[in-house]
Curated annotation (Swiss-Prot):
Posttranslational mods: One or more lysine residues are methylated.
Gene3D superfamilies given in the database record: Ribosomal protein L11, C-terminal domain, Ribosomal protein L11/L12, N-terminal domain
Protein's recorded name: Large ribosomal subunit protein uL11
CDD domains: Ribosomal_L11 (cd00349)
UniProt entry keywords in alphabetical sequence: Methylation, Ribonucleoprotein, Ribosomal protein, RNA-binding, rRNA-binding
Pfam families from the UniProt entry: Ribosomal_L11, Ribosomal_L11_N
Gene (name only): rplK
NCBIfam families: L11_bact
Description of how the protein assembles with itself and partners: Part of the ribosomal stalk of the 50S ribosomal subunit. Interacts with L10 and the large rRNA to form the base of the stalk. L10 forms an elongated spine to which L12 dimers bind in a sequential fashion forming a multimeric L10(L12)X complex.
HAMAP family per record: Ribosomal_uL11
A biological process term (GO) from this entry: translation
Length: 141
C-alpha cells in the first residue's frame, strides 16, 4: 500500500547550501521531518549546480519520511547570470539595465523547457523574453 501524503512544501534554497536555519528548518520541523537528513540529501544532489537558488518540492508522508524533486533554477536567476547584472531594474519600462541576445534567450529556454508549462520552443522563448522585459533586460538580435 502507498504511503499517505500529509503535506507538500515548496522552497527555493541555494544549491548545495541547505541548512537547518530558516526557511528550511521551520518549514520541515513543523511537519516532523528529519531536517539534517533532508539537508544532506539536498546538498548532495545540488552540489554541482553553481550558486543558483534551486526550487524544491518536498513531499512529506505520514510516517515522517519524505521525497523531494529539484527543479531548474528560476528564469530570472538565469537571465541575471547571462546578462551579468545583480538585480532587475527598479523601473523596467524606462531603465534598461542590460541586453540579451536571442541565442542566450534560446539557451535559457532550452534549459528551462521541462519546468515550463509549454511544449514548443517558441512559447518557451516568449516566456523567457517576457521575464527579461519585466526585469528591464532588453532582447536584441
Amino acid at each position: 500500500m502507498a504511503k499517505k501524503v500529509v503535506g507538500e512544501i515548496k522552497l527555493q534554497i541555494p544549491a548545495g547550501k541547505a541548512n537547518p536555519s530558516p526557511p528550511v528548518g521551520p518549514a520541515l520541523g513543523q511537519r516532523g521531518v528529519n531536517i539534517m537528513e533532508f539537508c544532506k540529501a539536498f546538498n548532495e544532489r545540488t552540489k554541482d549546480m553553481g550558486s543558483f537558488n534551486i526550487p524544491v518540492i518536498i513531499t512529506v508522508y505520514q510516517d515522517k519520511s519524505f521525497t523531494f524533486i529539484t527543479k531548474k533554477p528560476p528564469v530570472t536567476d538565469l537571465i541575471k547570470k547571462a546578462s551579468g547584472v545583480e538585480k532587475g531594474s527598479d523601473n523596467p519600462l524606462k531603465n534598461k539595465i542590460a541586453k540579451l541576445t536571442h541565442k542566450q534567450v534560446e539557451e535559457i529556454a532550452q534549459l528551462k523547457m521541462e519546468d515550463l508549462n509549454t511544449s514548443t520552443m517558441e512559447a518557451a522563448k516568449k516566456i523567457v523574453m517576457g521575464s527579461a522585459r519585466s526585469m528591464g533586460v532588453e532582447v536584441v538580435d
